[in-house]
C-alpha cells in the first residue's frame, strides 16, 4: 500500500494544476460550488429497469422454482386462479339442471307425486312482471310449505337457492362477459 506522503512531486504538481484549472473555470463562468452540484443533479441518468417490489421480494412471488418433489403440470403458471362464476364446483349449467331435476324427482317421490318445481330463471332480456295469479299461487304455496315435511321444505329452499341464486347469477355473469367481448371486438 502506498501512503500519501510517499508520492512523487509530479503528482502534487498535477493535483495543484488541476485545481487551478477548475478554479479559473469557475471564475470565468462566475459559478459557485453549489451551482455546479445543481447542474450535476439535472444531468443524472435515471435507471428505468423494473425492480421487484419489497412485497414480491418478501413473498418470493418472482421465483418459479418447484418446492415440491415433482414438477407442476404443463401451463400451471399460466392458468387462472379464479373463475367468474359462482360456485364453479357445481359444474356446468347443464349439470346444475340435471342436479335440480334429481332433487325435484326425489321430492316428488317423497310427496307421492304432489311436488312440482318449475324453474323461475327467466331469459335476461325479458322482464317478468308477476301477475295477480302468480301472487295468489305463491301465497298458497307458502301456506302449503308450512304444512309439509321438513325435508321437503329444505329441498324447496335448496332448489330455489340453486335456481334463483346461483343459476340466475351465472346467467347474468355470462351476459356481462358476452357484452364485454362484444365491446372489445366492436
From Swiss-Prot:
Residues 121-146 are annotated as: Disordered. InterPro entries: DUF5399 (IPR035407). It comes from the Bacteria. Pfam families: DUF5399 (PF17377). Belongs to the chlamydial CPn_0422/CT_273/TC_0545 family. This is Uncharacterized protein TC_0545.
Amino acid at each position: 500500500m502506498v501512503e500519501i506522503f510517499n508520492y512523487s512531486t509530479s503528482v502534487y504538481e498535477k493535483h495543484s494544476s488541476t485545481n487551478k484549472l477548475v478554479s479559473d473555470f469557475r471564475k470565468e463562468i462566475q459559478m459557485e460550488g453549489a451551482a455546479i452540484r445543481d447542474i450535476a443533479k439535472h444531468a443524472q441518468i435515471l435507471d428505468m429497469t423494473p425492480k421487484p417490489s419489497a412485497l414480491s421480494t418478501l413473498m418470493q412471488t418472482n421465483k418459479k422454482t418447484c418446492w415440491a418433489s415433482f414438477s407442476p403440470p404443463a401451463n400451471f403458471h399460466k392458468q387462472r386462479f379464479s373463475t367468474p362464476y359462482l360456485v364453479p364446483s357445481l359444474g356446468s349449467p347443464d349439470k346444475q339442471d340435471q342436479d335440480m331435476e334429481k332433487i325435484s324427482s326425489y321430492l316428488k317421490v317423497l310427496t307421492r307425486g304432489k311436488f312440482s318445481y318449475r324453474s323461475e330463471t327467466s331469459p335476461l332480456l325479458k322482464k317478468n312482471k308477476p301477475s295477480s295469479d302468480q301472487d295468489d299461487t305463491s301465497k298458497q304455496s307458502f301456506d302449503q310449505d308450512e304444512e309439509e315435511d321438513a325435508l321437503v321444505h329444505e329441498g324447496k329452499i335448496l332448489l330455489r337457492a340453486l335456481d334463483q341464486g346461483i343459476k340466475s347469477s351465472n346467467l347474468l355473469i355470462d351476459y356481462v362477459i358476452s357484452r364485454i367481448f362484444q365491446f372489445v371486438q366492436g
